[in-house]
Amino acid sequence: MTKRAFLFAGQGAQKLGMASDLYAAYPVVKETFDTASRILGYDLRELIDSNEEKLNQTRYTQPAILTTSVAIYRLLAENGIIPDIVAGLSLGEYSALVAAGALSFEDAVALVAKRGEFMETAAPAGSGKMVAVMNTDPSLIEEICQQASEKGVVTPANYNTPAQIVIGGEIAAVDYAVELLKEAGAKRLIPLNVSGPFHTALLESASQKLAAELETVAFNDFDLPLVGNTEATIMKSVDVKALLARQVKEPVLFYDSIATIQEFGVDEVIEIGPGKVLSGFLKKIDKTLPTHNVEDQASLDALLNA
């Protein structure tokens, strides 16, 4: 019996027209988008298909990716493909909560629209930067970030793979950390095109607003295990609100989360949502783990015929 993990895509994976073929072909996908549009008060499908500028603004990106991901999840469930364990990268954690039965889709849509707004306000475009540091010892990166903190906020934000760690924070501090990392022998440092320095202390105000918002939402018990980003452990219902509030300002422990999923005995991973970013990380973490992604009709067919 296959033990299957679903991984849900995070911000940055969005693209114009994502899942438009699935929307046209499957009622469950269309219904999911229609529900989201009703809650948001604008036509989400139209925005995804025709307004790239808005699609890349955090307050719109987040409900767009969540809705695309949950629609694909529901389509897979209709085809009898269901997970034994779930996780999501940052924003993707909200899709994972829906899949795990802990959060209604309607509440998730309203919540991530607010989350996107809070994050945009806390870290407006141009207020900070993020840089991927390749093939460098994680403890050296942590040490150098601490050193560079004399210039402002800079910390590891995403532990994507053991060979790719993203640092983020205030521009002067990140630039200084990059300088120190180069002096220490780091060869590949890639500035990222992101809306803001997410998963750093600069998101403190967003974290506080989100904590207040989360108090108004009812969470249910989990139907299946979910590995959370912030501690890379299986989330307990009692901790969900606190962990989600922390998640926006603390690093994402992605490769540790994958280790937890592997301890669960998973032998197949399906990435859900636009792009193949997480599948790419997985290949770097453990290339023996069978991985699929589902984002459109072609990738759905490939999975169903595998």
Language-model features, listed with the residues they occupy:
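FabD-like malonyl-/acyl-CoA
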Residues: 2-140, 188, 268-297, 302
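Short, flexible segments with low predicted structural confidence
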Residues: 4, 8, 48, 153, ...
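Alpha/beta catalytic cores of group-transfer enzymes, especially the acyltransferase/condensing modules
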Residues: 12-13, 101-242, 246-248
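Glycine-rich phosphate/pyrophosphate-binding beta-alpha loops
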Residues: 61-63, 197-198, 251
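Residue-level signal for well-ordered alpha-helical scaffold segments within enzymatic catalytic domains
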Residues: 74-78, 143, 212, 260
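Non-catalytic positions within long, well-ordered alpha-helices that form the structural scaffold/packing
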Residues: 77, 182, 262-265
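Cys-dependent protein tyrosine phosphatase-like superfamily
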Residues: 219-228, 241, 246, 250, ...
